[in-house]
Regions:
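Short beta-to-alpha linker loops that shape the active-site pocket of alpha/beta-hydrolase fold enzymes
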Residues: 108-113, 177
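Short, surface-exposed "cap/lid" segments of acyl-processing enzymes
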Residues: 55-101, 106-109
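Hydrolase active-site cap/lid region
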Residues: 169-199
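N-terminal cap/lid segment of alpha/beta-hydrolase-fold proteins
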Residues: 29-71
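Active-site signature of alpha/beta-hydrolase-fold catalytic machinery across serine-
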Residues: 91, 160-164
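Catalytic nucleophile-loop/oxyanion-hole region of alpha/beta-hydrolase
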Residues: 114-142, 147
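Gly/Ala-rich beta-loop-alpha elbow adjacent to hydrolase catalytic centers
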Residues: 149-158
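N-terminal membrane-anchoring alpha-helices
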Residues: 1-39
Length: 199
């Protein structure tokens, strides 16, 4: 009996001391984008050029209204969902931007759009939010007011940003991911959670 208790206790100890996802920092200030509007497209292209495995059509890009690098009254930022890309909203987001005479930024959010044997293995909620936060900062550079258009988990990020950044003028959400409803969703937050959900 003592041996069983000892083995069980050891198992519990190993489980509780296993790797665990760190609690993310949800609310942060927007990063400073030092490039001016004439340089910002090149700055984005330079950042994307650091990756040699971006899937075609998944790269971050700005579409200027009338192809002129000039700040518009409104800008749009499209936040794609988990495992998605800006193609998810095509052509609706671009059509709406054209109707509103606005510039639009289509970011590739953190760890997305890459050719990899293990896609999104580096993904964390905090880094995903950080990249959405940068996208909002870019949106402010290219428009006086920013509309966030989003799909699925992109809506999760957009709601978080809007809660902390009143400069968000409006949200346009399609199929928002507000809450995970799977009964075992908590497993991912437990020690060894990443390894368990990958099985």
């Amino acid at each position: 009996m003592k041996k069983v208790v000892l083995i069980f206790s050891l198992f519990i100890l190993i489980f509780l001391t296993g790797p665990k996802v760190e609690k993310p920092v949800i609310f942060k200030d927007l990063p400073e984008i030092k490039s001016n509007i004439d340089e910002i497209k090149s700055w984005i292209d330079d950042n994307e050029s650091k990756f040699n495995n971006i899937k075609e059509g998944n790269e971050s890009r700005i579409i200027f209204h009338d192809s002129v690098p000039k700040k518009t009254d409104l800008s749009m930022v499209y936040l794609h969902g988990f495992s998605g890309s800006s193609q998810d909203g095509f052509p609706v987001h671009i059509n709406i931007a054209q109707k509103l005479n606005s510039n639009i930024y289509l970011p590739r959010l953190f760890a997305h759009g890459l050719k990899s044997s293990e896609p999104l293995i580096e993904y964390t909620g905090e880094k995903y939010l950080d990249s959405a936060r940068e996208a909002l900062a870019i949106g402010k550079k290219i428009g006086e007011k920013v509309i966030l258009m989003c799909t699925s988990t992109g809506c999760t990020a957009a709601l978080t940003l809007a809660a902390n950044h009143p400069e968000v003028e409006a949200l346009v959400m399609y199929a928002p991911n507000i809450r995970i409803t799977h009964p075992l969703d908590f497993v991912a937050t437990l020690p060894w959670g990443l390894y368990l959900v990958r099985r």
